[in-house]
Amino acid sequence: MKPMVLTLLLAIAMLQLAMAEPTYRVFVSNEEDNSLSVIDSRSNKVETTVAVGERPRGIGFSPDRAHVYVALGDEDAIAVVDSRTLQLVKKLPSGSDPEAFAVHPNGHIYLSNEDANKASVLDPASGKVLAEIPVGIEPEGVGITPDGKLAMVTSESTHMVHIIAIPEHKVTANVLVGARPREVAFSADGRWAYVTSEIGGQVSKLDIATSKIVQTAQLDVPNAKPKGVVVSLDQRTLYVSTGGANAVAVVDADTLTQKATIAVGKRVWGLALSRDGSRLYTCNGLDNTVSVIDTATNQVIATIPVGKRPWGVIIDD
């Protein structure tokens, strides 16, 4: 190989490696500020605020983490923000009232259209909606199984989880859960799904292979209205936000027994766990703050002011 060609290939490889480096930024959607707060996770300080559009709620990364996607409920669009330059790149048509979404490893965005009672599949590369899938009333949470073969959508008023085959985009099962299901998370091995039910005050455990609920537990937190749920790195623990109960419930993933309660800010909503599992970030919607929790001690180690009514949070680390 000629030296010039080798040098060029090495330069390209180094550039790709540099682009893969994390930014160590935490991104927070602020529902009533129409903005995205960008936090430096190393200093726990807000780096900047990005105007994104009307009523930002659901938030996620592209598979390469080069872009942040934000659902704009009052614009019927998905905002695309460059995760490094922090510039608003474009807006993609999403269908009516997008609330939450999940990004498939192939790059497609699976989203809930809350007031249209459907889920949509959006290709960010072309900007086209590839499929529209009827589901229950007021679809909310969306998750994709670790193997990428299923999407799950919760419907708040139908009290169900709708299981959708990928790439067929057909509903294969409708699973009744607790009242007003909000969010779904998965074990890393793809065996279990965990579903929060806001009005029911419950967490349910769903066997993905059989599409059956195997266990449901009430949270041991007064006035708990569970919303967000994430699974710990070792798969042994669930962290569940409790809405107006102003706490995070720490739950055994095997037995659904509650192990601890962590007091945070008012109306705790979206959650995100750092890649190494050592830090949990919570959106406190009525305090306009984000709490940072040390998961080794279950203690809040920082409280960060952000925009008005923080809804969702993700971290690039």
PLM regions: where:
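Bacterial N-terminal signal peptides that target proteins for export
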Residues: M1-L8
